[in-house]
Curated annotation (Swiss-Prot):
It is found in: Cytoplasm, Nucleoid. Pfam families: YbaB_DNA_bd. Binds to DNA and alters its conformation. May be involved in regulation of gene expression, nucleoid organization and DNA protection. It comes from Helicobacter hepaticus (strain ATCC 51449 / 3B1). Belongs to the YbaB/EbfC family. InterPro entries: YbaB-like_sf, YbaB/EbfC. Gene3D superfamilies: Nucleoid-associated protein YbaB-like domain. The gene is ybaB. GO terms for molecular function: DNA binding. It comes from the Bacteria. Homodimer. This is Nucleoid-associated protein HH_0332. The keyword DNA-binding applies. GO terms for cellular component: bacterial nucleoid; cytoplasm. Keywords: Cytoplasm, DNA-binding.
Length: 108
C-alpha cells in the first residue's frame, strides 16, 4: 500500500542529500594540465573555472597557447562531468530501492 509519510520522508532526505552534494561540489577542486604543465586550469565541482595558470614562455606564441588552453579546458571539463556522474551514482545508490512505499515489492 502507498505510504505518503514514507515517501515524504524519503523526498526530504533526498533534498538534504542533494544540497550536501552541491555544497561538496563547490569545495571540490579539479585540475588539468597541458603542454607538460605549461598551462593549468582548475575548476570547482560545479564547473566554474577558478584558476588558470600559463607559463610565461607561451605568451609570445599565440597559436600554441590557444591549443594548450583548449586542451586543458576540455580535460578539466571532462573531469567535472565524470565527477558529476560519479556523485549522481553515489546519490542514487544511497537512496535505496524500497519500493514498498509505492505499494510494490522490492526486487530480489
Amino acid at each position: 500500500m502507498f505510504d505518503a509519510k514514507q515517501l515524504g520522508a524519503m523526498l526530504g532526505s533526498m533534498q538534504d542529500t542533494i544540497k550536501d552534494l552541491q555544497e561538496r561540489n563547490e569545495q571540490t577542486i579539479l585540475s588539468a594540465k597541458s603542454g607538460g604543465g605549461l598551462v593549468s586550469v582548475s575548476c570547482n565541482g560545479n564547473g566554474e573555472v577558478i584558476d588558470i595558470s600559463i607559463d610565461d614562455s607561451l605568451l609570445e606564441d599565440k597559436e600554441s597557447l590557444q591549443i594548450l588552453l583548449m586542451s586543458a579546458l576540455n580535460d578539466v571539463r571532462k573531469s567535472v562531468e565524470d565527477n558529476r556522474q560519479s556523485s549522481a551514482m553515489n546519490l542514487f545508490n544511497g537512496l535505496g530501492t524500497d519500493l514498498n512505499i509505492f505499494g510494490g515489492k522490492p526486487n530480489g
